[in-house]
From Swiss-Prot:
Entry's localization field: Cell inner membrane
Chain ranges passing through the membrane: none
Keyword hit for Transmembrane: no
Protein known as: Elongation factor 4
Role summary: Required for accurate and efficient protein synthesis under certain stress conditions. May act as a fidelity factor of the translation reaction, by catalyzing a one-codon backward translocation of tRNAs on improperly translocated ribosomes. Back-translocation proceeds from a post-translocation (POST) complex to a pre-translocation (PRE) complex, thus giving elongation factor G a second chance to translocate the tRNAs correctly. Binds to ribosomes in a GTP-dependent manner.
Gene name for this UniProt entry: lepA
Gene source species: Chlamydia caviae (strain ATCC VR-813 / DSM 19441 / 03DC25 / GPIC) (Chlamydophila caviae)
Bilayer topology annotation: Peripheral membrane protein
Keyword Protein transport among record annotations: no
A molecular function (GO) term: translation elongation factor activity
EC number: 3.6.5.n1
Length: 602
């Protein structure tokens, strides 16, 4: 680390919608400041996972410290890269709390999108200095002036200092570096001398254990300090070393001081011991009050994960345990299902988080897994006054003891070209949405605000929105409140036996259509047997839909050549009795493909 000067430190973040060029601009900044040598440079350097590179998204926050000489002074520029997706909005808010400014990157052809809007509002709440960056000006469709007007009219940001650039060609990158130094203020001189550091992320390293990423607000942290976490009131730990991101995590001599960004290692064993947003202080001279804004991260979406081969259960357990080391938001609980065997009930921050975990299990651990349909947490008030919170259809109580049920709702902002307005309104109506307001973003695009049940969002809302807007629509959501809903348990019976893996909680108005589509799908995927198999959808033991898999026909009279008809009748009667007995005692084997196909039903 170079000479410490508080007034020469700039802490900033980058806010951008998916595919607007955030990681590419970060690459150009690293190149221009010579933080990374040319031979070590690669695309999306800060995105370390293959999954991040392929999808073009940032999943984990990646800080990096750069040094840049300007007007004879050397400035320390700390970039705290953040995930852009709404699922990780709490992590984004804590990363922004560690900064004094942010770069708002907007595609000069596509314009402002929903997820960048959501994060801009988080930055404005923190009173950060926001510098608009109009990227991809090399594209033929780029229209920087139109995008400037969008930013001014809809977000209310002054675009006098907006910078037009092209991360691809490198045009405008030096102007961005100068704007960071000129416009983003240095960290404030702390009034306190006690250590107060904000945790904005953590990472498990197999060699050194847990690395805690911090922005020091006041005081300093160094090797040998005894520290504790204020919000969680945990036990004390000894700091074994402090480091900086240059751009790789590198241990340094000395200390991390007020305004600086870095990490420390201590004898911490689990990521769960370290909560994002918590305040670090010393045991000897503790700070009086913690930093504000801390809250526990609770999962929002739940799904069951089961191995296709039951012998892979221990491997799956190990895989989830390893993923949890770097993902404190992932919750895991062992569960069993009559039809799927042993597996895990997992909690996620949202649908993208769930998809990432599934994909990493398959890729990194080479496992074949089945996932049950995602569900949300329902609040059930019983007639005896007790309240239950359930996320699994198997935990649904007897309907006769339920007073009422409440479901979580979310506030949704959708940005779309005008021509798709009626299609989106029909989609939201089908999803039980309530329209709050419609605003013009510019001459061609609208912002629609809706309240929607979370259950409708986690299933297929994103896919359907992309479909009806030909890929041009984008949305973000934030959790709202619980509202009374007519949610019931739909059971699927195969050969009169309920199959728990197909059970789901649905709105009463959609139960019959959902039940019918599941029954029709199962008729196609369950192989025929020597007896008829009824497939039924039922609510509270009342059948609302039914399909039948016809029996395989076997010609038992094939060996009878002519002769008396009574011989044939005896054989037919015997076959009839045998089929009746098979229907009573026969087990229907459900192939794994059936579970996967049912999950694909809209």
């Amino acid at each position: 680390m170079k000479e410490y000067k508080l007034e020469n430190i700039r802490n900033f973040s980058i806010i951008a919608h998916i595919d607007h060029g955030k990681s590419t601009i970060a690459d150009r900044l690293l190149e221009s400041t010579s933080t990374v040598e040319q031979r070590e440079m690669r695309e999306q350097l800060l995105d370390s996972m293959d999954l991040e590179r392929e999808r073009g998204i940032t999943i984990k926050a990646h800080p990096v410290t750069m040094y840049y000489e300007y007007n004879g002074e050397v400035y320390q520029l700390n970039l705290i890269d953040t995930p852009g997706h709404v699922d990780f909005s709490y992590e984004v808010s804590r990363s922004l709390a560690a900064c004094e400014g942010a770069l708002l990157i907007v595609d000069a052809a596509q314009g402002v999108q929903a997820q960048s809007l959501a994060n801009v509002y988080l930055a404005l709440e923190r009173d950060l200095e926001i510098i608009p960056i109009l990227n991809k000006i090399d594209l033929p469709a780029a229209n920087p002036e139109r995008i400037r007007k969008q930013i001014e009219d809809y977000i209310g940001l002054d675009t006098t200092h907006a910078i037009a650039c092209s991360a691809k060609t490198g045009e405008g990158i030096s102007e961005i570096l100068e704007a960071i130094i000129e416009l983003i203020p240095p960290p404030k001189l702390p009034e306190e001398t006690e250590l107060k550091a904000l945790i904005f992320d953590s990472h498990y390293d197999p060699y050194v254990g847990i690395m805690v990423y911090v922005r020091v607000i006041s005081g300093e942290i160094k090797k040998g300090d005894r520290i504790t976490f204020m919000a969680t009131k945990g036990s004390a730990f000894e700091v074994l070393g402090v480091g900086a991101f240059l751009p790789e995590a590198t241990l340094i001599e000395g200390s991390l001081r007020a305004g600086q960004v870095g990490y420390f290692i201590a004898n911490l064993k689990k990521v769960k011991d370290v909560k994002i947003g918590d305040t670090v202080t010393t045991v000897k001279h503790p700070a009086k009050v913690p930093l504000d804004g801390f809250k526990e991260i609770n999962p929002v979406v739940f799904a069951g994960i089961y191995p296709i081969d039951s012998s892979d259960f221990d491997t799956l357990k190990d895989a989830l345990g390893r993923l949890q080391l770097n993902d404190s938001a992932l919750t895991i609980e062992q569960e069993s299902s009559h039809s799927l065997g042993f597996g895990f009930r997992c909690g996620f921050l949202g649908l993208l988080h769930l998809e990432i975990v599934f994909e990493r299990i398959i890729r990194e651990f080479d496992l074949d897994i089945i996932a049950t349909a995602p569900s949300v947490i329902y609040k059930i008030v019983l007639k005896n006054g007790k309240t239950l919170f359930i996320d699994n259809p198997t935990a649904y109580p007897d309907p006769s003891i339920i007073e009422h049920l409440e479901e979580p709702w979310v506030h949704v902002n959708i940005i779309t070209p005008q021509e798709y307005l009626s299609s989106i309104m029909n989609l939201c109506l089908d999803k039980r949405g309530v329209c709050l307001k419609t605003e013009m973003l510019d001459q061609h695009r609208l912002v629609l605000s809706y309240d929607l049940p979370l259950n409708e969002i986690v299933s297929d809302f994103n896919d359907k929105l992309k479909s009806v807007t030909k890929g041009y629509g984008s949305f973000d959501y934030r959790l709202g409140d619980y509202r009374k809903g007519s949610i019931i348990k739909l059971e699927i019976l195969i050969n009169d036996e309920p199959v728990d893996a197909f059970s789901c909680l649905v709105h009463r108005d959609k139960a019959e259509a959902r039940g019918r589509s599941i029954c029709e799908k199962l008729v196609d995927v369950i192989p025929q047997q020597l007896f008829k198999i009824p497939i039924q959808a039922a609510i509270n033991k009342k059948v609302i839909a039914r399909e039948t898999i016809r029996a395989l026909s076997k010609n038992v009279t094939a060996k009878c050549y002519g002769g008396d008809i009574t011989r044939k009748r005896k054989l037919w009667e015997k076959q009839k009795k045998g089929k009746k007995r098979m229907k009573e005692f026969g087990k229907v084997s459900i192939p794994n493909t059936a579970f996967i196909e049912v999950l694909k039903i809209d």
